[in-house]
Amino acid sequence: MEYVTMVTFPVESQAHEAFSHLKNKPVTSSYTILQMVIVKNVDGNVVPKDGFDSGQDTTDDTWMGGLLGAAVGILGGPIGILLGGGVGLLAGSLVDESDAADNTSLLAYSSRSLLPGQTALIALVQEDDSADFDMQFEGMDCAVMHWDAAEIADEVDQADQIQKELAKEARDKLRAQRKADRHEAIEKKRAE
């Protein structure tokens, strides 16, 4: 089964140390790392720092291949900024309060757990049991969370749809404001 795993570190060097270790041995008898990325919360913006792609095929390359890139793009884009100040609009649209409390949403969890200055390693991993992969972080000051990759793909699709709707709403409001401004200018000229 494929999972998205997020490991948050308060110290960036530990994230890079874990990344290097995993990059040098991405395939074991119990797990295969398909992709991974290091991201850092820089003043509320999620910034990619390093990435790795094993070149291994995923179960369904058509939607899984760009999953981490899409998730990081959402976390680092306008929706991620909305989430940065708290769970915010998007998380409220995607998950209800009980889901946010039990960490079933990558976006909601990230907004609460990846604090400014902190770094995370996010990996797409094929594994039957997360225990062996989790052991790679033993002795490190970090928090490890796992999500079913199919659920994250659905969450990313929902976030993308919301982002498109917000962009359309913003364009419509700008268009209406310009129209109102033109109408006001015309009325002003008529009054002269």
Predicted regions and their residues:
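Amphipathic, membrane-inserting segments
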Residues: 112-174
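Extended, charge-rich low-complexity interaction segments
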Residues: 60-75, 172-192
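Membrane-engaging insertion elements
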Residues: 86-124
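Short, low-complexity, glycine-enriched hydrophobic/amphipathic alpha-helices that associate
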Residues: 54-101
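A common structural junction motif
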Residues: 1, 23-32, 138-146
